[in-house]
Amino acid sequence: MNEHQDLQKSFLETVSFDSNGLVPAIVQDHESGKVLMMAWMNRESLEMTLKNRKACYWSRSRKKLWLKGESSGNMQDVHEILIDCDGDTLLLKVSQKGGACHVGYHSCFYRKAKSDLSLEICDTLMFNPEDVYGKKN
């Protein structure tokens, strides 16, 4: 086993997956520091991400691996993966191509609460979801 494989093994053994075999992953733009999204990873998706340096997650609703940008083309190139002190949350620093959010915004955190408790759009719309995913029935 070479040193790189040994480091990967050590990292994977450090991750504390929950009872469903998942760990939350916060995704951040590696240049600006802007938080783009939160997704879930299982061991297989994390291994794929480490190997290919393309963000791959676990879709809880579809119950399958989800290569980010597979349908939309809005891929995430992974620069770094950090792990928190408890080993139960990951931070992926990525280069985002297009929008990270499936509703078309650069970040999934595109709304903020105003003092009157109403919502305000605070991000850039990058694409029309109907153009990418088709119309919902």
From Swiss-Prot:
InterPro entries on file: PRA-CH, PRib_AMP_CycHydrolase_dom, PRib_AMP_CycHydrolase_sf
Quaternary structure and interacting proteins, as annotated: Homodimer.
Record's catalysed reaction(s): 1-(5-phospho-beta-D-ribosyl)-5'-AMP + H2O = 1-(5-phospho-beta-D-ribosyl)-5-[(5-phospho-beta-D-ribosylamino)methylideneamino]imidazole-4-carboxamide
Record carries keyword DNA-binding: no
One Gene Ontology molecular-function label: zinc ion binding
Residues that bind Mg(2+): D84, D86, D88
UniProt binding sites for Zn(2+): C85, C101, C108
Superkingdom assignment: Bacteria
UniProt-listed Enzyme Commission number(s): 3.5.4.19
Protein name in UniProt: Phosphoribosyl-AMP cyclohydrolase
Compartment(s): Cytoplasm
GO annotation terms (biological process): L-histidine biosynthetic process
Organism encoding this protein: Chlorobium phaeobacteroides (strain BS1)
Family the UniProt entry places it in: Belongs to the PRA-CH family.
